[in-house]
From Swiss-Prot:
The chain crosses the membrane at residues 93-113, 123-143, 155-175, 191-211, 233-253, 268-288, 533-553, 573-593, 600-620, 627-647, 685-705, 708-728. The gene is SLC45A1. Keywords: Disease variant, Epilepsy, Intellectual disability, Membrane, Phosphoprotein, Sugar transport, Symport, Transmembrane, Transmembrane helix, Transport. This is Proton-associated sugar transporter A. GO terms for molecular function: D-glucose:proton symporter activity; galactose:proton symporter activity; sucrose:proton symporter activity. It comes from Homo sapiens. Belongs to the glycoside-pentoside-hexuronide (GPH) cation symporter transporter (TC 2.A.2) family.
Amino acid sequence: MIPAASSTPPGDALFPSVAPQDFWRSQVTGYSGSVTRHLSHRANNFKRHPKRRKCIRPSPPPPPNTPCPLELVDFGDLHPQRSFRELLFNGCILFGIEFSYAMETAYVTPVLLQMGLPDQLYSLVWFISPILGFLLQPLLGAWSDRCTSRFGRRRPFILVLAIGALLGLSLLLNGRDIGIALADVTGNHKWGLLLTVCGVVLMDFSADSADNPSHAYMMDVCSPADQDRGLNIHALLAGLGGGFGYVVGGIHWDKTGFGRALGGQLRVIYLFTAVTLSVTTVLTLVSIPERPLRPPSEKRAAMKSPSLPLPPSPPVLPEEGPGDSLPSHTATNFSSPISPPSPLTPKYGSFISRDSSLTGISEFASSFGTANIDSVLIDCFTGGHDSYLAIPGSVPRPPISVSFPRAPDGFYRQDRGLLEGREGALTSGCDGDILRVGSLDTSKPRSSGILKRPQTLAIPDAAGGGGPETSRRRNVTFSQQVANILLNGVKYESELTGSSERAEQPLSVGRLCSTICNMPKALRTLCVNHFLGWLSFEGMLLFYTDFMGEVVFQGDPKAPHTSEAYQKYNSGVTMGCWGMCIYAFSAAFYSAILEKLEEFLSVRTLYFIAYLAFGLGTGLATLSRNLYVVLSLCITYGILFSTLCTLPYSLLCDYYQSKKFAGSSADGTRRGMGVDISLLSCQYFLAQILVSLVLGPLTSAVGSANGVMYFSSLVSFLGCLYSSLFVIYEIPPSDAADEEHRPLLLNV
């Protein structure tokens, strides 16, 4: 017979005596003392190192397993661990984009100069695309955040931008031939110049904009544990794509039978680039299924419906009396005749922290995807006006009750509108036929605990033989916020209190500008640092082949085509492609080892090394005319490129673990990952705008392409200082220091 709830002393209700828990003792020694060991979203203080996962508190015993049809449970928001193949295919679009971009950067300047574009104007070709990107990139990011296409939020944008890049590439590499077919004559390529410039703008904008939905796509479908791997694979594939692109561009196809058959160097390059971009785009689109975004008006049944199926709680036996007999399923071996053991049993209470994210909870919840789903009831404070839940008395059932160890009175404190939790109780009638789960204080009109009002979760018992045992429905009390933890990972309080049900504000330019102007300080400093990095890198990248042709090989792009100076310039452009190939492969190699380096070096140190190496590499290239020295310095360019493609987005993911940074839907400060990724990418466009405005006149003033390398070296050293002194690598704990002293479920 289970004693009534009123007869249980408060101390025993919170911490059950050891005698009834003899079956637990061997596996959870000292569990009651672990209630003060908790996990908040700041438990790791946003430190990325060390990356080893640590157990926050010991595990109580696993409960019995209860069969549950998987189709009844919505696990759509859970992200299982992705395989290397999935992450590789997901990042293939970066390979194709960088392959195409390598062709663009290698051949745009030489092609335009050879068609007669003046020196003062050729840098302005890069001016239009970044302006479009700067104006449209945040809008595209915000639009993708709210896209409700059945193909997902990111994949439609990836497809459209890839098509735009392919069309721009067609105009860029075939503009001269199309112009001649229209009206151009030798010495006057006005149509060819117009088509080539349009192709550069379309190709550059589409290629740069495709990076953002591809990064957001990976972050949407991957757990936090896979996001670092995904970013590194993205940078690796981007480096490999650029490397192979420069290899193709560095071959003299005019001297091969294949090149002569296709009609020249540019035709071969176009064929390789079009095929590569098309194949990689298809691989990315089919890599990982993307779940469509529900319209704002559609309610989320998995979170709000009281019929959400979840398994029942584990039984814990009362004190055995002299005349009592044990029921058929006991807590000794934690299994039952109707519930065979699961091959993968989650350990309740052993939540794991990594990089301040609740990765362990996602892994814990993802373990439900087995043949036999483990049952769970996290019995904690509800303190609300809850109706009693009853199992029909006609169904035979052993008189059992369950409760996990609870925190003492006053352990949970009132904060930010959440009232102090009150103790819940499990009561049973005298006949033992009814199992009631409710609150001691039932007079309150609304929930006042740390968790919101529990939902009634009905589960059909699908296992077992015939008779009433097979048709009974088990009613389980499960808090909505706990369900959010298990099924959705990290959810902030504003989303769990019902504010997420409100219709989101419509997207507008004014609201977007407000988001940009009111960006957090951490994001602002990261954007400035990102801008300096791209400013130095783009100055080198866009004009490196011209630097090799004019400075290193002493050629002249405007000389007669039969002259030696013109041939030297072409040889320099080809050798510049091989230099860019070295840079791209060094970027791929550095991306492969960057994750290992993060275990030994801080992000600040890695930033410092990247900027310093690039500044030295570009500066020393202007002091030497030795071809091998200049080519070997290209290794330093890959270090900065890999850093710019990885570390800013990794820091942004860390920032989003801060509740203050992410904002709240209730007060309209909620931020979107797509918008913030676009804000980071806008720094690339700003850098390209400044490069296009400054480097043309600077090159004319200096008299050679050496001015480009001087500029890049100087800006890189400025970025080195800024990344060391101003960038915020850890969100200060003062914004929510008290959260370190609260249990796990309070602020999840």
